[in-house]
Amino acid sequence: MSTPIELPKWADVSLVPILAVVVAFLVAGLVVLGIGENPVKATVLLIQGALGSGEGIGYTLYYATNFIFTGLAVAIAFHAGLFNIGGEGQATMGGLGAALICLRLDFLPWYIVLPLAILSAMAMGALWAFIPGYLQVKRGSHVVITTIMFNFLAATLVVYLLVNVIGKPGSMSPETRVFAASAHLPYLHEALAYFGIKIPKSPLNLCFVLALIASAFVWVLVWHTKLGYAIRTVGHSPTAATYAGISIGRITLITMAISGALAGMLAVNEILGVQGRLLLEFSSGYGFIGIAVALMGRAHPVGIVLASILFGILYQGGTELSFEMPRVTRDMIVAISGLVILFAGALDGLIRRPVAGVFARLLKSGA
């Protein structure tokens, strides 16, 4: 059997994901062609809708913010050999944590209530991920199974609380009252207007800056700290980690807590940045898209930011495309996103093997 060719790092990180996206769009183009629409025109409309105006860019980055947080949450768990697919539940609990602070303390000035709400969102997300980690360490319950279960538990708990405990009195919708202005994270156009910089209005808020800070934090933590080295060691070889004196259980608990805290930050973008209240299903599937983002980004913060922007383009551009081409429905945009996930994740080998073959031939010809 021939020895598999190891791709250069630049090819693995950039070339393979780009080719996966290209193949996914080609397949999606065939689907669009099959319903009688022009795939080239559809692609142009999608890109124009996402990047063709200041407002479109704002919406694209707003969606990307959610994907950055969930992508980072999945990625840091990946590095420890864990598969945290409970981002939905952790984000939901993060929203609950932020809402409880805002409902009780939004009479306080913004410089008190906002940090408390953000910390509460992170703490609730961390707790909701810590428990499955604890169950795996102490009881042997696999984290994949427990995080799936905790997604449903979080959704059920929040529904109960919204209907029976913290919901707005007299409201037919399961949601809380609107928070006071002091508990609202400023929109980016509002923040920049303070410095005399004008940009179009959009839901993009200061949480995008927090997402970039979180990306830098994960990069420093994973690759430039002792804890990060321990996390990567456990992920690469638990046996080697044990021989090195690293507690696998401790690393599992810490990593899951950090992962959950990052997922909880999604609630900051949605609840504090846009909605201004807690309502049902605000996470809208962002937690599961985060898995694809982490895979496409090769679990590296830079790759995750770029992959998040790509999915932000698909979300925003797809919305505009469905208006211009009614036959290209929102469900079809979801299918296109699914194709990107398919080729970037499950069928990654279909792209990697041909690329590796090309590099192998280049190496032989250069020998």
Q: What spans do the regions from the language model cover?
A:
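Membrane-interfacial amphipathic/re-entrant helices at transmembrane-helix boundaries
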Residues: 2-70, 111-112, 116, 198-201
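Single transmembrane alpha-helix segments in multi-pass membrane proteins
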Residues: 30-35, 45-105, 118, 122-141, ...
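Hydrophobic core segments of alpha-helical transmembrane domains in multi-pass membrane transport
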Residues: 17-33, 70-74, 95, 99-101, ...
